[in-house]
Every structure is written in C-alpha cells, then in structure tokens.
C-alpha cells in the first residue's frame, strides 16, 4: 500500500470521522426516539445526511490522489472503526438522548479539530481541492458541534439534578 503524506492521512481521518458520524447519529436517533423527541430526530436526520455527503465528497477527493485512494480509504476505515469502538463504550443499554448528545458533542469537537488541522495542512501545501473541501465542510462541522452542545445543555436543563442516575 502507498505511503501517505500528512495531508493525505488527515484526509483519510476526516473521511473516517464522517463515516463514523453517520453511525453515531443513527444510534443517537434511536435514543431520541425512545423519549419521543421529534425535534431532535429531525436535527439528527439532517446531521446524518450531511455526514453522508461529507464522506462522499471526501471519498471523491481521495480518488484524485494518484495511486493513493486505497491507502486513504484504509486510513478512513481505521478511523471509522475507532469511532465505532468509542461509541460502543460510551453509549450502553442505559443511555438516553442526553447521553447521546453528550457523545455527539465530544465527537463533533473532535471533527472540528481534525478539519482545522486539514485546513492548515492544505493551506501550507497550497492544495486547492482540499482547501475547497475544507471550506465547505468546516462550517458544517462547526454548526454540528454547536447544535450538539446546545442540545446537550437543553436536555440537561430538563433533568432533575437530584434524581438518581
């Protein structure tokens, strides 16, 4: 398999994080449905659609790296698998919508950080196509982070702090 540059490796990571986000939003949607939170389900469906589009755009861009697409997508699969492991550890049978959005807050913060690193690498390398992708994806990831953070706070506000956990 081809050796990857830091830029190519980071592209693989953000691709894998987008793939993992698709699974994470599906899991949190299941938790939101348990508590009949229709507003949350609509938010999660949009986030999931945007994660799918991000993964597709990343995969398409990876195809433009001569002889490197397979290696970039292998990096993506490894990152996706790590995300799936984190999801399985964090959300168990006792989890609720708040737990799900707390997880999404962490995951989205991580995605924002990865996209910002890719942005810096692309700028330094003057990689126009990567910079264009980052310009499209980073604002979406920042919005996802803010939505997850605010939704966590909203759900927490409806909890009785003195109830048993």
Residue ranges and their predicted role:
Residues 1-165:
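Amphipathic alpha-helical hairpins
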